[in-house]
Amino acid sequence: MTLWINGDWVTGQGERRVKTNPVNGEVLWQGSDADATQVAEAGRAARAAFPTWARLPFAARQAIVEKFAALLEVHKAELTAIIARETGKPCWEAATEVTAMINKIAISVKAYHARTGEQQSELPDGAATLRHRPHGVLAVFGPYNFPGHLPNGHIVPALLAGNTLIFKPSELTPWTGEAVMKLWQQAGLPPGVLNLVQGGRETGQALSALDALDGLLFTGSANTGYQLHRQLSGQPEKILALEMGGNNPLIIENPEDIDAAVHLTIQSAFVTAGQRCTCARRLLVKRGEQGDAFLARLLEVSQRLTPGEWDDEPQPFIGGLISEPAARHVYEAWQRLEAMGGRTLLAPRMLKAGTSLLTPGIIEMTGVKQVPDDEVFGPLLSVWRYERFDEAIRMANNTRFGLSCGLVSPDRKQFDQLLLEARAGIVNWNKPLTGAASTAPFGGVGASGNHRPSAWYAADYCAWPMASLESPTLVLPDSLSPGLDFSREEPV
């Protein structure tokens, strides 16, 4: 029984699914997808649970969410192993994901009060009050790269605001989704407040088509995000938050410490085997001896990166990709770039047939025309050389995406220029592109999102504002508008 609907664990009636470790093939999870009838049942359960959940005092909802955080702490080692085994990422990185899930709770409580709390201002004859109300029933579509943390970034603020939810994890990470739901169950969520439906495209289409939905919160690829946007077109009454990917540029401009710049670049491009939406995909390096020295050192260090299994000792920097087909897709993308005229600096290698272990690849594309503006979700970095900083900014902005952009430079004036001209939601200076703070918004423009950033701003799309003019008494104004006559006729 792998679906959680209205407080009960039930067996899916859809397609049978088996999840294996992407590196060693170990069977980890078996279950069946939710069919359309079960998705509709989850919608009805969430709708029925909404009035009571929304009317609970905030402190009562907060207490349940904080109990969930405490359970995450208790089960940290267990959940770390589940995430690592299911995604292929090393144990050390899976542990940081669980820590981020725990920290998200307190941050979300603060964000709720800061972004969507209650405010009142006095007026001469009363008061103006701002309150926030939950939307109702929201669907959450989770990604596979951070199967615990990223859905958590939608679920926690949505529950705090008083919404009820239907969560569909990625079909590539059903085990993590199930494990997290069991912790929510232990935390004492009332039946129907949070429902779990497993499945792939058919389940997702049934969920996004539900009339019961008041909104949909999505993290994933631009292609799927655009499909959801089209599906919900003509329904402005439904909130849609799209957090999508990027073709992110990192500019290297005369670094003072080459090893530090190489470290930052590797953290930006290859952490999580390149499977972060903010990962650097395009490396813009200034021409000259310093740029040449930087690239030589980058190649030297990058070729030592050998992916390993989640529990290898010593622990590897990167593990496998989410699946063998995903690794093959990245490898074939490198082959296509090379066929277009790219010059391979470091060739990626599939380490073992039938597994997702792929070494990083670096290819120079300077001067190559009509390079596809695609997000290749893996450890593949293209290099572009430039002469002037203005040229680097134009190259950085030459994408339909707009998620993250970074600059490595000792010159603050260059960063100030980048801040003014960059078209991206995240613009970093001498920090990895993959670094993000939950105390700041997280999201992009263009094909990277629809202006609904998450993290600190997630509270904004989890509630709508209600404005009130209030007075405890009703009296006739001393001064009336022209044309109004409230005089009383004397009786005859």
Curated annotation (Swiss-Prot):
NAD(+) binds at G220, S221, A222, N223, T224, G225. The active site is at E243, C277. It comes from Citrobacter koseri (strain ATCC BAA-895 / CDC 4225-83 / SGSC4696). The gene is astD. Belongs to the aldehyde dehydrogenase family. AstD subfamily. This is N-succinylglutamate 5-semialdehyde dehydrogenase. Catalyzes the NAD-dependent reduction of succinylglutamate semialdehyde into succinylglutamate. It comes from the Bacteria. InterPro entries: Ald_DH/histidinol_DH, Ald_DH_C, Ald_DH_CS_CYS, Ald_DH_CS_GLU, Ald_DH_N, Aldehyde_DH_dom, SuccinylGlu_semiald_DH_AstD. One of its GO terms (molecular function) is succinylglutamate-semialdehyde dehydrogenase activity. Its EC number is 1.2.1.71. One of its GO terms (biological process) is arginine catabolic process to glutamate. Gene3D superfamilies: Aldehyde Dehydrogenase, Chain A, domain 1 (3.40.605.10), Aldehyde Dehydrogenase, Chain A, domain 2 (3.40.309.10). Pathway: Amino-acid degradation; L-arginine degradation via AST pathway; L-glutamate and succinate from L-arginine: step 4/5. It catalyses: N-succinyl-L-glutamate 5-semialdehyde + NAD(+) + H2O = N-succinyl-L-glutamate + NADH + 2 H(+). Keywords: Arginine metabolism, NAD, Oxidoreductase.
